[in-house]
Protein backbone atom coordinates (compact mmCIF):
# COMPACT_ATOMS: atom_id res chain seq x y z
CA UNK A 1 0.00 0.00 0.00
CA UNK A 2 1.50 3.31 -1.07
CA UNK A 3 0.36 6.58 0.46
CA UNK A 4 1.26 10.23 0.43
CA UNK A 5 1.06 12.62 3.39
CA UNK A 6 -2.35 13.76 2.01
CA UNK A 7 -3.81 10.26 1.77
CA UNK A 8 -6.51 9.66 4.41
CA UNK A 9 -5.49 7.09 6.99
CA UNK A 10 -7.66 4.03 7.62
CA UNK A 11 -9.96 4.39 10.63
CA UNK A 12 -8.03 1.67 12.46
CA UNK A 13 -5.02 4.03 12.54
CA UNK A 14 -6.78 7.40 12.65
CA UNK A 15 -9.42 6.82 15.34
CA UNK A 16 -6.95 5.84 18.11
CA UNK A 17 -4.98 8.99 17.30
CA UNK A 18 -8.07 11.18 17.62
CA UNK A 19 -8.90 9.61 20.99
CA UNK A 20 -5.31 10.25 22.10
CA UNK A 21 -5.43 13.90 21.01
CA UNK A 22 -8.62 14.38 23.03
CA UNK A 23 -6.91 12.73 26.00
CA UNK A 24 -3.98 15.18 25.68
CA UNK A 25 -6.36 18.14 25.58
CA UNK A 26 -8.71 17.16 28.38
CA UNK A 27 -6.61 15.21 30.86
CA UNK A 28 -2.90 15.78 30.35
CA UNK A 29 -3.05 19.56 30.24
CA UNK A 30 -0.19 19.79 27.74
CA UNK A 31 0.55 23.08 26.03
CA UNK A 32 -0.76 23.67 22.52
CA UNK A 33 2.83 23.64 21.26
CA UNK A 34 3.46 20.18 22.73
CA UNK A 35 0.12 18.91 21.43
CA UNK A 36 1.00 20.11 17.92
CA UNK A 37 4.42 18.44 18.11
CA UNK A 38 2.90 15.15 19.22
CA UNK A 39 0.26 15.30 16.50
CA UNK A 40 2.81 16.08 13.79
CA UNK A 41 5.07 13.22 14.85
CA UNK A 42 2.27 10.69 15.24
CA UNK A 43 0.67 11.58 11.90
CA UNK A 44 4.04 11.08 10.20
CA UNK A 45 4.46 7.70 11.87
CA UNK A 46 0.92 6.67 10.95
CA UNK A 47 1.76 7.39 7.30
CA UNK A 48 4.85 5.16 7.61
CA UNK A 49 2.68 2.40 9.02
CA UNK A 50 0.22 2.70 6.15
CA UNK A 51 3.04 2.66 3.60
CA UNK A 52 4.25 -0.62 5.09
CA UNK A 53 0.78 -2.13 4.77
CA UNK A 54 0.09 -2.21 8.51
CA UNK A 55 -3.49 -1.41 9.43
CA UNK A 56 -3.44 -1.43 13.21
CA UNK A 57 -1.19 0.10 15.88
CA UNK A 58 -1.03 -3.24 17.69
CA UNK A 59 1.03 -4.57 14.77
CA UNK A 60 3.93 -2.27 15.70
CA UNK A 61 6.90 -3.96 17.36
CA UNK A 62 10.23 -2.74 18.77
CA UNK A 63 11.97 -3.53 15.48
CA UNK A 64 9.70 -1.11 13.63
CA UNK A 65 10.34 1.62 16.20
CA UNK A 66 14.11 1.13 15.90
CA UNK A 67 13.81 1.16 12.11
CA UNK A 68 11.89 4.43 12.33
CA UNK A 69 14.52 5.95 14.63
CA UNK A 70 17.30 4.82 12.28
CA UNK A 71 15.50 6.32 9.30
CA UNK A 72 15.27 9.64 11.11
CA UNK A 73 18.99 9.60 11.90
CA UNK A 74 19.90 8.78 8.30
CA UNK A 75 17.75 11.65 7.09
CA UNK A 76 19.64 14.03 9.37
CA UNK A 77 16.91 14.53 11.95
CA UNK A 78 18.11 16.45 15.00
CA UNK A 79 18.55 14.41 18.17
CA UNK A 80 16.00 16.64 19.93
CA UNK A 81 13.41 16.07 17.19
CA UNK A 82 13.99 12.33 17.26
CA UNK A 83 13.61 12.36 21.03
CA UNK A 84 10.25 14.14 20.62
CA UNK A 85 9.16 11.55 18.05
CA UNK A 86 9.98 8.66 20.37
CA UNK A 87 8.48 10.40 23.39
CA UNK A 88 5.19 10.99 21.58
CA UNK A 89 5.15 7.38 20.42
CA UNK A 90 5.79 6.06 23.95
CA UNK A 91 3.02 8.25 25.36
CA UNK A 92 0.61 7.12 22.67
CA UNK A 93 1.32 3.44 23.25
CA UNK A 94 0.95 3.91 27.01
CA UNK A 95 -2.47 5.39 26.27
CA UNK A 96 -3.43 2.36 24.14
CA UNK A 97 -2.24 0.01 26.90
CA UNK A 98 -4.37 1.92 29.39
CA UNK A 99 -7.39 1.34 27.13
CA UNK A 100 -6.57 -2.34 26.70
CA UNK A 101 -5.79 -1.96 22.99
CA UNK A 102 -2.14 -3.01 23.36
CA UNK A 103 -0.39 -5.29 25.83
CA UNK A 104 3.14 -3.83 25.74
CA UNK A 105 4.88 -0.62 24.71
CA UNK A 106 7.24 -1.37 21.78
CA UNK A 107 8.87 2.07 22.07
CA UNK A 108 9.84 1.62 25.72
CA UNK A 109 13.37 0.36 25.15
CA UNK A 110 14.26 2.60 22.20
CA UNK A 111 16.03 5.86 22.96
CA UNK A 112 17.25 8.73 20.83
CA UNK A 113 21.00 9.38 20.61
CA UNK A 114 22.17 11.98 23.06
CA UNK A 115 22.52 15.46 21.70
CA UNK A 116 26.19 16.19 21.28
CA UNK A 117 27.31 19.12 23.36
CA UNK A 118 30.17 21.14 21.93
CA UNK A 119 33.25 20.75 24.09
CA UNK A 120 34.98 23.89 25.27
CA UNK A 121 38.33 24.73 23.76
CA UNK A 122 41.09 23.84 26.13
CA UNK A 123 43.77 26.27 27.24
CA UNK A 124 47.27 25.70 25.94
CA UNK A 125 50.06 25.23 28.48
CA UNK A 126 51.24 28.84 28.16
CA UNK A 127 47.74 30.13 28.91
CA UNK A 128 47.52 27.89 31.98
CA UNK A 129 50.88 29.16 33.24
CA UNK A 130 49.78 32.74 32.61
CA UNK A 131 46.54 32.19 34.54
CA UNK A 132 48.29 30.60 37.50
CA UNK A 133 50.89 33.33 37.95
CA UNK A 134 48.97 34.69 40.92
CA UNK A 135 51.36 35.83 43.66
CA UNK A 136 49.26 37.91 46.02
CA UNK A 137 49.24 37.66 49.82
CA UNK A 138 45.52 38.32 50.21
CA UNK A 139 43.81 35.20 51.68
CA UNK A 140 41.15 35.23 48.95
CA UNK A 141 43.81 35.36 46.22
CA UNK A 142 45.66 32.48 47.89
CA UNK A 143 42.40 30.53 48.06
CA UNK A 144 41.66 31.20 44.40
CA UNK A 145 45.10 30.12 43.26
CA UNK A 146 44.80 26.97 45.37
CA UNK A 147 41.41 26.21 43.79
CA UNK A 148 42.72 26.69 40.26
CA UNK A 149 45.89 24.71 40.94
CA UNK A 150 43.86 21.85 42.41
CA UNK A 151 41.29 21.85 39.62
CA UNK A 152 43.96 21.83 36.92
CA UNK A 153 46.33 19.61 38.92
CA UNK A 154 43.74 16.91 39.63
CA UNK A 155 41.21 17.37 36.80
CA UNK A 156 38.27 17.95 39.12
CA UNK A 157 34.71 18.72 38.20
CA UNK A 158 33.34 21.94 39.69
CA UNK A 159 31.01 20.02 42.01
CA UNK A 160 33.91 17.85 43.15
CA UNK A 161 36.10 20.85 43.94
CA UNK A 162 33.37 22.53 45.97
CA UNK A 163 32.59 19.35 47.91
CA UNK A 164 36.19 18.67 49.01
CA UNK A 165 36.63 18.77 52.79
CA UNK A 166 39.86 19.47 54.65
CA UNK A 167 40.01 15.84 55.75
CA UNK A 168 40.01 14.70 52.09
CA UNK A 169 43.43 16.26 51.41
CA UNK A 170 46.68 14.42 52.10
CA UNK A 171 49.43 16.95 51.44
CA UNK A 172 52.34 14.66 52.26
CA UNK A 173 51.36 12.04 49.71
CA UNK A 174 49.77 14.52 47.27
CA UNK A 175 46.55 12.51 47.29
CA UNK A 176 42.96 13.68 47.23
CA UNK A 177 39.76 11.84 48.09
CA UNK A 178 37.04 12.83 45.63
CA UNK A 179 33.32 12.06 45.61
CA UNK A 180 32.28 12.08 41.97
CA UNK A 181 29.08 11.48 40.04
CA UNK A 182 26.77 8.91 41.58
CA UNK A 183 28.54 9.38 44.93
CA UNK A 184 31.42 7.26 43.64
CA UNK A 185 34.64 7.73 45.55
CA UNK A 186 38.04 7.86 43.91
CA UNK A 187 41.53 8.87 45.01
CA UNK A 188 43.56 11.04 42.70
CA UNK A 189 47.07 12.47 42.84
CA UNK A 190 47.59 16.19 42.43
CA UNK A 191 50.50 18.28 41.25
CA UNK A 192 53.38 19.66 43.28
CA UNK A 193 52.21 23.21 42.65
CA UNK A 194 48.74 22.28 43.86
CA UNK A 195 50.30 20.79 46.98
CA UNK A 196 52.24 24.00 47.60
CA UNK A 197 49.27 26.32 47.19
CA UNK A 198 46.75 24.18 49.04
CA UNK A 199 49.27 24.17 51.89
CA UNK A 200 49.50 27.97 51.75
CA UNK A 201 45.73 28.20 51.79
CA UNK A 202 45.41 25.89 54.79
CA UNK A 203 47.73 28.19 56.74
CA UNK A 204 45.40 31.19 56.23
CA UNK A 205 42.07 29.35 55.95
CA UNK A 206 41.39 29.86 59.65
CA UNK A 207 41.15 33.61 59.05
CA UNK A 208 37.98 33.05 57.01
CA UNK A 209 36.45 29.68 57.92
CA UNK A 210 33.61 29.55 60.44
CA UNK A 211 34.18 27.34 63.50
CA UNK A 212 33.54 23.69 62.66
CA UNK A 213 33.25 24.30 58.89
CA UNK A 214 34.57 21.13 57.16
CA UNK A 215 34.89 22.56 53.62
CA UNK A 216 38.38 23.01 52.22
CA UNK A 217 37.40 26.13 50.29
CA UNK A 218 35.21 28.70 52.02
CA UNK A 219 33.68 32.03 51.07
CA UNK A 220 34.10 35.39 52.78
CA UNK A 221 31.16 34.34 54.99
CA UNK A 222 33.17 31.40 56.29
CA UNK A 223 30.97 28.68 54.80
CA UNK A 224 31.50 26.32 51.86
CA UNK A 225 32.08 28.28 48.68
CA UNK A 226 29.31 28.08 46.06
CA UNK A 227 29.57 26.84 42.50
CA UNK A 228 28.67 30.29 41.20
CA UNK A 229 31.38 31.99 43.27
CA UNK A 230 34.05 29.65 41.90
CA UNK A 231 32.92 30.32 38.33
CA UNK A 232 32.87 34.07 38.91
CA UNK A 233 36.29 34.20 40.58
CA UNK A 234 37.97 32.11 37.89
CA UNK A 235 36.52 34.27 35.13
CA UNK A 236 37.76 37.37 36.94
CA UNK A 237 41.26 35.94 37.31
CA UNK A 238 41.31 35.12 33.61
CA UNK A 239 40.67 38.78 32.82
CA UNK A 240 43.08 40.04 35.46
CA UNK A 241 45.86 37.78 34.17
CA UNK A 242 45.12 38.88 30.57
CA UNK A 243 44.34 35.37 29.35
CA UNK A 244 42.69 35.64 25.94
CA UNK A 245 40.34 32.70 26.50
CA UNK A 246 37.38 32.87 28.86
CA UNK A 247 38.24 30.90 31.99
CA UNK A 248 35.79 28.43 33.51
CA UNK A 249 36.17 25.47 35.88
CA UNK A 250 35.15 23.06 33.12
CA UNK A 251 37.76 24.51 30.80
CA UNK A 252 40.48 23.85 33.40
CA UNK A 253 39.31 20.23 33.79
CA UNK A 254 39.18 19.86 30.02
CA UNK A 255 42.69 21.30 29.71
CA UNK A 256 43.97 18.87 32.35
CA UNK A 257 42.50 15.94 30.42
CA UNK A 258 43.83 17.09 27.07
CA UNK A 259 47.33 17.88 28.32
CA UNK A 260 47.57 14.59 30.23
CA UNK A 261 46.47 12.58 27.22
CA UNK A 262 48.77 14.45 24.85
CA UNK A 263 51.81 13.80 27.05
CA UNK A 264 51.04 10.25 28.19
CA UNK A 265 48.85 8.70 25.46
CA UNK A 266 47.38 6.64 28.31
CA UNK A 267 43.64 6.80 27.78
CA UNK A 268 42.83 4.35 30.57
CA UNK A 269 44.80 6.30 33.17
CA UNK A 270 43.15 9.57 32.16
CA UNK A 271 39.76 7.87 32.38
CA UNK A 272 40.51 6.89 35.99
CA UNK A 273 41.76 10.36 36.88
CA UNK A 274 38.66 12.02 35.43
CA UNK A 275 36.29 9.57 37.08
CA UNK A 276 34.62 8.56 33.81
CA UNK A 277 32.65 5.33 34.05
CA UNK A 278 33.01 4.61 30.33
CA UNK A 279 36.18 5.13 28.34
CA UNK A 280 34.09 6.37 25.39
CA UNK A 281 33.35 9.48 27.45
CA UNK A 282 37.07 10.11 27.81
CA UNK A 283 37.62 9.64 24.08
CA UNK A 284 35.03 12.28 23.26
CA UNK A 285 36.10 14.61 26.04
CA UNK A 286 39.78 14.68 25.18
CA UNK A 287 39.82 15.46 21.49
CA UNK A 288 43.20 14.27 20.27
CA UNK A 289 44.21 15.57 16.91
CA UNK A 290 45.45 13.18 14.25
CA UNK A 291 49.10 13.97 14.95
CA UNK A 292 48.81 12.72 18.53
CA UNK A 293 46.84 9.67 17.47
CA UNK A 294 49.46 8.80 14.86
CA UNK A 295 52.24 9.29 17.39
CA UNK A 296 50.50 7.01 19.88
CA UNK A 297 50.07 4.38 17.16
CA UNK A 298 53.72 4.56 16.11
CA UNK A 299 54.90 4.15 19.67
CA UNK A 300 52.50 1.38 20.64
CA UNK A 301 51.80 -0.85 17.65
CA UNK A 302 54.35 -3.70 17.20
CA UNK A 303 54.23 -3.48 13.41
CA UNK A 304 54.25 0.30 13.14
CA UNK A 305 58.05 0.58 13.25
CA UNK A 306 60.07 0.08 10.08
CA UNK A 307 62.84 -2.48 10.13
CA UNK A 308 66.50 -1.76 9.40
CA UNK A 309 65.92 1.95 9.08
CA UNK A 310 63.53 1.52 6.16
UniProtKB/Swiss-Prot annotation:
Residues 118-298 form the Tyr recombinase domain. It is found in: Cytoplasm. Keywords: Cell cycle, Cell division, Chromosome partition, Cytoplasm, DNA integration, DNA recombination, DNA-binding. GO terms for cellular component: cytoplasm. Residues 11-97 form the Core-binding (CB) domain. One of its GO terms (biological process) is DNA transposition. PROSITE patterns: CB, TYR_RECOMBINASE. The active site is at residues 157, 181, 250, 253, 276, 285. CDD domains: INT_XerDC_C. Belongs to the 'phage' integrase family. XerC subfamily. NCBIfam families: PRK00283.1 (NF001399), recomb_XerC (TIGR02224). Site-specific tyrosine recombinase, which acts by catalyzing the cutting and rejoining of the recombining DNA molecules. The XerC-XerD complex is essential to convert dimers of the bacterial chromosome into monomers to permit their segregation at cell division. It also contributes to the segregational stability of plasmids. HAMAP family: Recomb_XerC_XerD. Forms a cyclic heterotetrameric complex composed of two molecules of XerC and two molecules of XerD. This is Tyrosine recombinase XerC. It comes from Vibrio parahaemolyticus serotype O3:K6 (strain RIMD 2210633).
Amino acid sequence: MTTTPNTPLPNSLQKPLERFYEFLRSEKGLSLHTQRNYKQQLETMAQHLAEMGLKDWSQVDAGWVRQLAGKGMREGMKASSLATRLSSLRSFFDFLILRGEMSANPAKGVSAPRKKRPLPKNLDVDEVNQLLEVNEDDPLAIRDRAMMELMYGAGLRLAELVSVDVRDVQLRSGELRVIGKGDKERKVPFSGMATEWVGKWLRVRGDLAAPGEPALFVSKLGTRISHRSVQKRMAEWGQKQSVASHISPHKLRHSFATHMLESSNNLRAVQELLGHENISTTQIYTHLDFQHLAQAYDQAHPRARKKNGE
